[in-house]
Every structure is written in C-alpha cells, then in structure tokens.
Amino acid sequence: MGEADVVPTPWIYPADEPDPEEALAAPEREEAIEAALDAALELDPAAIRDLYEVLLPPPSVGEGDPTGCPLLLTYDYGTAKAFYWQGECTDSLGTTFSGMGYASWFEKAQFDDGVLADGFDYSLSGRIEAADGTWLEGAGVISSYYAEGPDTHGFGRAIDGVYQAGGPRAPDNVWLTSARRPSLRVDGWTYRPTQGTNLTLTGGLSGLDGFPGGVTAVSFEAFTMRSATAASPCPSEPGGLASIRGPSGAWVDVSFHGLTDEAPKPDPEACDGCGDSFYRGAAAGPTCVDPSSFLDWEGDEPW
C-alpha cells in the first residue's frame, strides 16, 4: 500500500474547535462592574413588598383562618410578626391565589450593644391577582433591614428570585418589569462621627440587557468597598471577587486587593485600584474600579 493511500475508518472525528473567544477588554469589564454596582444600589425589595401588601394586606395576629381562601396562619414573636398563606382559590373580593407565601416583619428588635433594628422578609411561590387585573407572581425571597447603634447605622437589602407584576396598580419598577434575575444581597453601614461608609455585595445579577460589552451577568463574592473615613487601609480599591460573563457565556474573574471582613489587612503594595483578571485560567490583565463614587452618600444610606 502506497503512502498516498487512505485507509477508511468507521470513526467520525469532530471538527477542530475554534479558538476561544478573547476575554472582554479591560474597559468593558470595568464598565460592566460599575453598571452592576449602580444596579445593586437600586435594589428595591420594598416595591415588591408594597404590591404584595396591596394584594394581600397583612392580617393582624389572631386573624388567621386555616379553612379560608387562602389558608392563613398568623404568628406573634413579640417584636416580630408573621403570617403564612397557601391556596388555589378565589376569595370573596375576587382576588385569586395560586401558590404559597410567607411574610415576617420586626420593629425595634434589640440586639447586642444597644442596637435596634427594623426590617422585613417576604417570600412568594406563585401568583396573586386582584379583581381589577393587578397581579404579582414570582418565586423567591426579598428582605430589607436597618439598624441603629450608638454611632453606626447599618442597612441591608436583598432580592433572591424573579418577580413580575402588571395591571393598573402595579408600579413601573425595574425589579418587577424587566428580565433581570437577581440573587443579590447588599449590606452596609455608616459610621456617623466621621461619615465613614462601607458596602458589601454577595451574589449577582443575570438576565442583563444593554450592559457594556454585551455582558449578561455579573456576580460578587465578599465584594467590599470601605472609605478612608471608615479607617480602610486601602480605600482606593475594593476587596473580594467580581466575575463578569460575556456574550459567549465565558466568565472573567477579577480578584481585588482591598480589605474584606475575612481579610481586613490587605497588602499595601498591592493596593493600586486594580484587581487581577483571569480568563479561562490565564491572566487577562488588570481591571480597575474606583469605589469612591459608590461610597459618597449623604445621610445614613446610599438609596
């Protein structure tokens, strides 16, 4: 058999894979992280809670009805109150319930060191629709709190899940009308004597549209920004991890050098405002984010 002869084979070999797409450029990574931070500071669980309460006003303790529409149970925990509902029914007002939910709220709950806190947690797995066509549906949990201490004001907001709403009484709110899919928590505090500020983000946002570079998702892990007036040794750079998913579905991870609660003493020589980026396991250059504009708020909270 000559060298030019070809021996048939029963195997089918896949075509060579194309070269992987290049990582997003640094400006696109930076703009996407900053856009996600802007969105995080617009996180609005209260808009969802308010519509929830329009459709299902919170009952007083003792007003529950385990045989009604919907099944409704109430709880009294002192400074906290709660209720649970479940049903597939239409009540006497024409409101239709399908699914289940839980809500709790607390006022002046006392914690260590004289801290007093107010807040709420609401969950929904299903749909509620009023007779006038106003509706809310979703699957997830929302929460919000603020806490008062002798010198510090703390706060936090979270949306974990997707909510949609419509009808004449539904608000025009991005967290109820867009394709965004949040699983994001934002916590922070203000130290009043020096107006020192701190923000920490955990979780992410997907289903993004119109973000720089076609980015479709951004996630954060212990992503912390703290001002110089809050005694940060590295106020010019965040700490923690940010990850950006490009239009191809591949992620770029950015590890920043600032402080986090787990690592409060960052290397001062690495504190240059830029994190180290990695794409498909290889270094992809620096990504720089200036936290100052996100920490410069008046009063106790950035919202």
Region locations from a protein language model:
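Low-complexity, intrinsically disordered segments exposed to solvent
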Residues: 1-303
